[in-house]
């Protein structure tokens, strides 16, 4: 009887099927931020934790600022999973200062992006790196071998799904009849890894390299902006310019060569759509759309609290496949 009890106890401890916690990290409260992070944590550890977002449902998290009271409340949780490339890094610092026992996982550890933060998850390869960061960090906090084994198996499933998604993108875009899309911002350049030409009509601050005869008055007249505004923006005290110096003009313009290229493609009937990550776009793109009867196609970047999901059947994978279908509208027309 005693041997049987010891055997059953061993099974309970190894499998996690006990009447008590088999690990301090089991049945914990985890706070995440945006949908891409929530999806990873839920996929890897959702069976063993209650997962929340620090943001209330329905708010615009880009404009929403957590109160000190909320930060202190979240700091009392067991684990905060965040993206150090975003404002969440500041929240993590405040929380750990409030509670030194709070465990942290940085999903973007060791990662960077070229154009926009959304590249970290819209590129399936990058997203897999984020998943590995979560998996490895959970493994550092968890001692129960059964839980670690479950996380590893969940990661293998995620790895398969993301690798398959990346392969689908590669195959579909490689077979596309047309290899160029037009977008209203640089974010879409993440598609260049699939050998797709992305012409961006993003408005950027004008950056000038000063030539020998340049003056601030000339620059002011050319861009219809006051000298004082240019001085203030560049933290300059006087109008003295040095050859080779870089000056920023605080107005946003689209690169003329890109705009002319798009106009040429439109005149040749090669462009029917302009891609955006928003339902609104800049005035130049809007004018192009109105004048040439083009369509603005909104790409779901998943950069929100719920990822733009409209029902429980939608996930990161289904939305990424829907985005691929949107790309095919232009590339396979």
What are these regions (language model features)?
Residues 211-245:
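LysM (lysin motif) carbohydrate-binding repeats in extracellular/periplasmic proteins that recognize
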Residues 1-22:
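Sec-dependent N-terminal signal peptides of Gram-positive bacterial secreted proteins and lipoproteins
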